[in-house]
Amino acid sequence: MSLQQKIKAYLKLGKLGVVSLLDLAAVAGAFLAYKHGISLLPIIPMFIGGTLASMGAMIINSGIEIDRDKVMSRTSKRPTVVGYVNRKEAIIVGSLLAILGTALGFIDNILTAFFIALGVVIYIFVYTILLKPRTWLNIVIGGFAGSAAAWAGYTSLTNSLTLEGFLLGFLIFMWTPGHFWSLALKYREDYVNAHYPMLPAVVGITTSARAIAISNALMIPIVLLLGYYINLIALIAFSILSLFLMFLSYRLILNPTKEEAIKSFIFSNIYLMLILLIMIIVKLI
């Protein structure tokens, strides 16, 4: 296997799509903390470090889950499953990236490095190893891994975590269950076959659709409170986006199918991305 092919395999294992959203959360956290006269340079080591650590965590996750990934159609083509990267190699390379990413966080401050490391620890040890194979609460508690990215971004400029910074991380925590349950509903049979107790594999489609709607509804007050802290423009934009999210959640309850679930999943991605982009834009204008 050539070096180019090996790098391509690791980039696939690193889940750049997921990591890019975590990066956006981190940058949004930094801009949320931004005040006139504060240097934006600390964003650079935080961004690079967070990216490397997040990719490292994803690679370790793929190394740990090879056996179950083999029986899931969604993951059966991963480089770890087809043999391009073995378990030991994935864990070693992922660990090195996570350590390097955390080390870069120290360029800013100890708190930023702590939150970068915290995201890795929660994703690997709490979510992947402890909770995912054992309880439907796996993604609920595991959502704090995404929160850590936002907190790393916020603390990179402030070396402290205030209420508004906490709210951004808590927003991501609240967003995570409904988002991933929508995906799990689409691939319910995969999780059943792999013996993962993801909520849709445990309670069925109809109850899962209701749980997704409830989870999204519980998130919205946090979104609106954050919008209130930012400014009126953000609050109005967040309200409009949240109304459409709940419309899709309502449609999923009325028609709990895989097709509606994937629509909910796709828009929840767009929803969070737009929330984070709006936060950045209103700080720039």
From Swiss-Prot:
Biochemical pathway: Porphyrin-containing compound metabolism; heme O biosynthesis; heme O from protoheme: step 1/1
Give the signal peptide, or none: none
Gene Ontology MF terms in the entry: protoheme IX farnesyltransferase activity
> What are the protein's UniProt keywords?
Cell membrane, Heme biosynthesis, Membrane, Transferase, Transmembrane, Transmembrane helix
What membrane topology is annotated for this entry? Multi-pass membrane protein
Q: Which GO terms describe its biological process?
A: heme O biosynthetic process
Question: Ligase: is it a keyword of this entry?
Answer: no
Give its E.C. classification number: 2.5.1.141
Q: Which HAMAP family match?
A: CyoE_CtaB (MF_00154)
Family label: Belongs to the UbiA prenyltransferase family. Protoheme IX farnesyltransferase subfamily.
In Swiss-Prot or TrEMBL terms, this protein is called Protoheme IX farnesyltransferase
Q: What is the lineage of its organism?
A: Archaea, Thermoproteota, Thermoprotei, Sulfolobales, Sulfolobaceae
